[in-house]
Swiss-Prot record:
Organism: Verminephrobacter eiseniae (strain EF01-2)
Enzyme class: hydrolase
Residue ranges of coiled coil: none
Lineage of the species this protein comes from: Bacteria, Pseudomonadati, Pseudomonadota, Betaproteobacteria, Burkholderiales
GO BP, one annotated term: L-histidine biosynthetic process
Top-level lineage group: Bacteria
NCBIfam families: histidine_hisI (TIGR03188), PRK00400.1-3 (NF001611)
Hydrolase listed as a keyword: yes
Keyword set, alphabetical order: Amino-acid biosynthesis, ATP-binding, Cytoplasm, Histidine biosynthesis, Hydrolase, Nucleotide-binding
Name of protein: Phosphoribosyl-ATP pyrophosphatase
């Protein structure tokens, strides 16, 4: 099935990127003078979290521009930048893209409104769920 092939390739791309990011950690020999990822990780959470905020804003701006006739491909580029920096954050915190995909799979088919209400009722946010994921 084409959808299965796309899903497999997408997971493979995310897994390969996660492995590269992991290899850039200082503990694994990453050199902040030669690697952007190593530099972000070396600078700590403030550096990559700031980038996540910047990239999220750029996604919003690209989408707003697309509403006024700009090239929608810009949205894809900005989302790719956002995902990349989020993956740096995941690596820093010892988490993986597979855990995010598992959470999305868990939520598939459920009402977002009901999901949010349940988390609020249980006093749980997504951070608690991430800690419980394998």
């Amino acid at each position: 099935m084409p959808d299965d092939d796309l899903q497999h390739r997408s997971q493979d791309i995310l897994a390969r990127l996660a492995a590269v990011i992991e290899s850039r950690k200082i503990a694994h020999g990453g050199d902040p003078t030669k690697s952007y990822v190593a530099r972000l990780l070396h600078q700590g959470p403030d550096a990559f979290l700031k980038k996540i905020g910047e990239e999220a804003t750029e996604v919003v701006m690209a989408a707003k521009d697309a509403d006024h006739g700009a090239d929608k491909a810009k949205i894809i580029c900005e989302v790719a930048d956002l995902w990349f920096h989020c993956m740096v954050a995941l690596a820093h915190y010892g988490l993986t893209p597979d855990q995010v995909l598992a959470e999305l799979q868990r939520r598939a088919g459920s009402s977002g409104i009901e999901e949010k209400a349940l988390r609020k009722l249980l006093g749980r946010g997504s951070a608690d769920q991430a800690r419980e994921s394998p």
